[in-house]
C-alpha cells in the first residue's frame, strides 16, 4: 500500500510539473519586448506612431551623440556588446571592436541607448528580437554587424525611414550579419515600416560574394496599426511592389540554400514561417491578441486558436493616439481571462477587520509574480505588455506639419512602463540630466535615475494591492499634466523656431530636462515613503 501511494504521489508530482512547464512557467523566460506602430491615417492627428518596450537587463543610459563632420578616409568602428555597454554591469558582455567601415562625410545626432532610438532628422526606431531557425545561425568568425550597431549607423546616416532600411540592409549584406533574427519598426513623419533581418548560416564568408544577411521590410498601410511582440510579422512578399516592400536580393534564395524552403513543394513562400524561430511560445502571441482586442475588437473575434494567423496589420476601430499606446504599455490584462491577479491562490481568509472570515484577495496579488512566488503558490504568470524586468520604453510621434526638431518626440521612461512615467524627449533636444546618462547595476546607486524607478517598481510588485493605488495617486496626475501642457509647449517652441531655431531647441531641451529632474525626485520620494509605509513595525494588513 505504501509503495502504491508513493508511486501515485510521484506520478501526480510529475504530471503537475509537466503541466506547469507546458502551460506557464516557460512563458516567463520568453523575450518580453513589444512594439506597436500606426500609420498617419490611423491616428487622431496624423502622427506616425512607433514604440518599444525593452525587456531584460540592457543598457538604459540615454546618451546623445552629437552630429559630426568627418574627413575623407575616416573609418567608423564596429562593435559587439553595445546593448550592455554600461561601465558597471553584472555579467556584461565586453565591448569588443570587430572591425571598421568607411565613415560618411556627415553623421546626424542620435539618441543612443541599448537599441538606439532616434536621430535629429525625425527617424525613430523600435527593436524586438525574433530569433531564428538553427539552419541560419551566423558565422561569428566572419560576420561583424549586430542589430544595435546597424541602428547606430542607420540613424547617423538616414533622413527617412526608407533610407534607413536601405542603408542597414546594405551594410548587413556587405559586412555580414552576426546577430539573432531581429525586427525593427522604423518611422519618419510620413510612413512606418516593419524591418526583419536574419543571418545566412555559419558557412558565410565575405569572399563568397554572396549577401551576408537576408532581410525584408514591409510598409504598414497608412490607415492600419501593427504590433511585433518578439515574433516575425511579414507574410508573403511581392518584391515588385516597391511602394510596400523593400527586400534583399536573396530574400528567397537564402531559404532554398539553407534547406528552409523547397520551391518544388508548390507551397507558398511565407517569410514569417521560414526564417524566424517557430518555437516561440504562446506569450508572444498573447501580447498580439491583447493589442488587437483593444484596438480592433470589431475585426474579431480574435480566437486564441488562430493566434498564429493574425494579419500583418489591422485597421483600428477608431483612430488612435500616442496615449492609447501608452495605455497598452501599462495594461495588465485586468478583467480578462489572462488576469494574473485572479488566480485562486491569491485569495485568503481575512482574520480581522470588516471582512473577517471572508475570502479576500491578498495585497501580495500581482500581475507579475516572481518565479519564486509562482513556485510557492503553484501558479504561473502569463506575459503582459508591461514588464517588471523592463530596462526602458518609449512611444513616439512623428508629425510632418511641424519642424522635425519639434515634430519628432518620443515619450520615454525607465524600468517598467506600468509603474513609470513617460517623459517627452524631442529630437531637437541637446541634453538630458546626468543621472539619466549613468547606470550601475552592480549596486544600489542614487546617482542613477534608473534606480529610482526600478526601486519603486520592485516595491509595487512585492505588495501590489496595497501600494499600486498609492502610486497611481501620484503618477496619474503627473502624467496628465504633461499631456495637457504638450500643445502649449510646442506652440511656444514653434514661435521661437520661426525667429531662431536654436532658441526653440534650447527651450525644449530645458523643458524635458526639468521634467526628468522632477520625475526622478518624485520617485525617490515615493521610494522612501513606501519604505516607511511597508515597514513591519508600521504596516498592518487585514489577514
Which residues fall in each region the model found?
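Bacterial N-terminal signal peptides that target proteins for export
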Residues: 2-10
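Bacterial N-terminal signal peptides
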Residues: 9-21
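Sec/Tat signal peptide C-region and signal peptidase I cleavage site
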Residues: 22-26
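A contiguous strand-loop segment
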Residues: 28-146, 167-322
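Second-shell loop/turn segments in exported
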Residues: 137-141, 149-158
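Glycine-rich, aromatic-lined ligand/substrate-binding cores of catalytic
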Residues: 253-409
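Substrate-recognition/cap regions that form aromatic- and gly/pro-loop-enriched pockets
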Residues: 360-494
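Histidine-centered catalytic/metal-binding microenvironments
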Residues: 474-543
Amino acid at each position: 500500500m505504501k509503495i502504491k501511494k508513493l508511486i501515485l504521489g510521484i506520478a501526480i508530482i510529475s504530471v503537475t510539473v509537466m503541466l506547469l512547464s507546458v502551460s506557464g512557467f516557460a512563458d516567463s523566460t520568453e523575450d518580453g519586448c513589444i512594439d506597436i506602430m500606426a500609420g498617419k491615417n490611423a491616428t487622431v492627428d496624423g502622427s506616425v506612431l512607433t514604440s518599444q518596450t525593452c525587456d531584460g537587463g540592457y543598457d538604459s543610459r540615454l546618451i546623445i551623440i552629437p552630429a559630426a563632420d568627418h574627413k575623407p578616409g575616416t573609418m567608423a568602428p564596429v562593435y559587439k556588446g553595445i546593448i550592455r555597454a554600461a561601465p558597471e554591469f553584472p555579467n556584461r558582455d565586453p565591448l569588443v571592436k570587430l572591425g571598421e567601415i568607411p565613415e560618411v562625410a556627415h553623421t546626424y545626432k542620435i539618441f543612443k541607448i541599448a537599441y538606439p532610438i532616434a536621430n535629429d532628422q525625425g527617424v525613430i526606431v523600435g527593436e524586438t528580437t525574433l530569433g531564428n531557425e538553427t539552419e541560419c545561425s551566423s558565422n561569428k568568425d566572419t560576420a561583424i554587424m549586430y542589430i544595435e550597431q546597424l541602428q547606430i549607423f542607420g540613424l547617423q546616416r538616414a533622413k527617412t525611414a526608407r533610407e534607413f532600411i536601405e542603408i542597414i540592409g546594405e551594410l548587413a549584406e556587405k559586412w555580414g550579419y552576426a546577430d539573432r533574427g531581429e525586427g525593427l519598426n522604423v518611422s519618419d513623419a510620413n510612413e512606418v515600416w516593419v524591418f526583419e533581418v536574419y543571418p545566412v548560416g555559419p558557412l558565410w564568408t565575405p569572399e563568397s560574394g554572396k549577401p551576408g544577411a537576408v532581410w525584408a521590410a514591409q510598409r504598414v498601410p497608412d490607415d492600419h496599426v501593427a504590433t511585433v511582440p518578439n515574433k516575425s510579422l511579414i507574410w508573403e512578399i511581392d518584391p515588385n511592389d516597391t511602394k510596400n516592400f523593400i527586400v534583399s536580393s536573396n530574400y528567397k534564395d537564402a531559404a532554398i540554400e539553407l534547406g528552409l524552403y523547397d520551391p518544388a513543394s508548390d507551397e507558398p513562400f511565407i517569410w514569417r514561417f521560414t526564417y524566424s524561430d517557430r518555437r516561440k511560445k504562446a506569450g508572444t502571441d498573447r501580447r498580439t491578441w491583447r493589442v488587437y482586442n483593444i484596438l480592433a475588437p470589431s475585426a474579431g473575434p480574435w480566437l486564441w486558436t488562430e493566434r498564429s494567423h493574425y494579419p500583418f496589420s489591422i485597421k483600428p476601430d477608431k483612430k488612435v493616439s500616442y496615449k492609447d499606446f501608452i495605455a497598452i504599455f501599462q495594461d495588465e490584462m485586468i478583467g480578462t481571462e489572462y488576469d494574473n491577479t485572479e488566480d485562486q491562490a491569491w485569495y485568503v481568509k481575512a482574520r480581522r477587520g470588516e471582512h473577517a472570515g471572508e475570502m479576500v484577495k491578498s495585497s501580495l496579488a500581482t500581475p507579475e509574480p516572481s518565479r519564486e512566488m509562482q513556485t510557492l503558490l503553484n501558479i504561473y504568470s502569463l506575459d503582459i505588455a508591461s514588464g517588471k524586468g523592463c530596462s526602458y520604453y518609449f512611444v513616439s510621434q512623428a508629425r510632418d506639419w511641424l519642424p522635425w526638431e519639434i515634430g519628432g518626440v518620443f515619450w520615454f521612461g525607465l524600468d517598467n512602463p506600468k509603474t513609470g512615467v513617460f517623459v517627452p524627449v524631442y529630437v531637437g533636444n541637446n541634453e538630458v540630466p546626468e543621472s539619466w546618462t549613468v547606470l550601475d547595476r552592480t549596486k544600489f546607486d542614487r546617482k542613477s535615475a534608473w534606480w529610482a524607478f526600478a526601486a519603486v517598481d520592485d516595491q509595487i510588485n512585492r505588495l501590489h494591492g496595497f501600494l499600486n493605488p498609492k502610486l497611481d495617486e501620484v503618477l496619474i496626475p503627473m502624467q496628465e499634466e504633461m499631456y495637457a501642457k504638450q500643445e502649449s509647449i510646442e506652440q511656444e517652441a514653434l514661435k521661437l523656431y520661426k525667429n531662431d531655431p536654436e532658441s526653440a531647441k534650447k527651450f525644449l531641451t530645458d523643458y524635458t530636462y526639468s521634467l526628468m529632474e522632477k520625475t526622478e525626485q518624485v520617485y525617490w520620494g515615493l521610494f522612501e515613503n513606501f519604505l516607511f509605509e511597508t515597514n513591519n513595525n508600521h504596516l498592518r494588513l487585514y489577514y
